[in-house]
Amino acid sequence: MKIPKGVTIAGVFVKIIREDLRDEDHHPKGYFGYYSHERRVIAIDKGLTPAAARDTIRHEMIHAALAMSGLDHLEHFEEEAVVRCMEEIFFPAYERFLRNLNRKKT
């Protein structure tokens, strides 16, 4: 999967970069990516598989949307719960929509 250079969220361009997100012993730090609102950057770990990279970018896009909506004042664990809930609701519905749309085209 080719990673896009960025994505526009709420009219704001957010750059997507790959970083080594492992510690000095090359162990995962416990996360696959992050969103920096100050830098307008989504960073994902260099070692992710294409599917994991896609899922991580989608996850961080939700964090970015929350921040741009002024909803980034939550505690980390609260924001993470909101993001995961939104992932479970929105993305399956969107993927079903795309499948149905593709069926109608054929």
Where are these regions (language model features)?
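Active-site recognition of the HExxH zinc-binding catalytic motif
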Residues: 55-67
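Metalloprotease/metallohydrolase-associated module, dominated by Zn2+-dependent proteases
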Residues: 1-52, 68-106
